[in-house]
């Protein structure tokens, strides 16, 4: 659920949705990327002038300024049946997926190739 919980509770979008919020450090840009089984869309809110920003993360975070636009957009997309965007679940992979997660292996390889970047003891 995380920062996108309002998609379910406030906007009543109960189908399977993956999403990611983002915010710049000075709250001048916020975005939300939403992924459904048959549509991927993103919303960015910001200004070209970097001095334009919200005073706090509570107001200027992607979950507060971009997610509401995305959720309202998706409500309208789902309401317009002529678009053919359904509220289906994600398709389960036919076979189990495996992903190697051995960060130490890659860190050692990077240290060999980039000795000047890594300093021992840090």
Question: Model-derived features: where do they sit?
Answer:
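A penicillin-recognizing enzyme superfamily signal
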Residues: 1-106, 119
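Short, low-complexity, Pro/Ser/Thr/Gly-rich segments in the mature regions of secreted, periplasmic
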Residues: 111-122
């Amino acid at each position: 659920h995380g920062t996108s919980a309002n998609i379910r509770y406030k906007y009543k979008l109960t189908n399977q949705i993956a999403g990611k919020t983002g915010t710049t450090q000075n709250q001048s840009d916020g975005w939300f990327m939403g992924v459904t089984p048959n549509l991927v869309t993103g919303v960015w809110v910001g200004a070209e002038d970097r001095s334009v920003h919200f005073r706090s993360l509570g107001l200027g975070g992607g979950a507060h300024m971009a997610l509401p636009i995305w959720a309202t957009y998706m409500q309208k997309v789902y309401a317009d049946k002529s678009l053919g965007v359904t509220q289906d679940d994600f398709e389960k992979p036919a076979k189990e997926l495996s992903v190697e997660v051995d960060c130490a292996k890659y860190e050692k390889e990077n240290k060999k190739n980039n000795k000047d970047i890594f300093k021992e003891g840090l």
